[in-house]
């Protein structure tokens, strides 16, 4: 989905006040010590390394002339990590978005994101990734399923 397509979609859709929203935000890059660019870590699958390096150093432009900044460089090899937190564009402005904290009270209608370090796009979906990372991704997903099961049913 393009940046402009995301903005258009976010203008149509709104968070429901009765639904809990969660987002995983994997990253397989590290910020360079001498610049604001990001490079893939050594465990990033070979098929994602070049794309990860490109995303980690390119600015994107919207149709209205606005552009992304270095916050958009961190990525999972396919998607920039900042896009995974939740909807921030659209005519209605950003949805409420918070980093998930295990001990905090969860509020419906709000987005909660969870950073997953050293995790690439392939591994989090269980396809073509590193076996160790896929196993770790499974553990995240099982833990999240348990979390979801514990949410109040209305």
Question: What is each stretch, according to the model?
Answer:
Residues 1-154:
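Lipid deacylating catalytic domains
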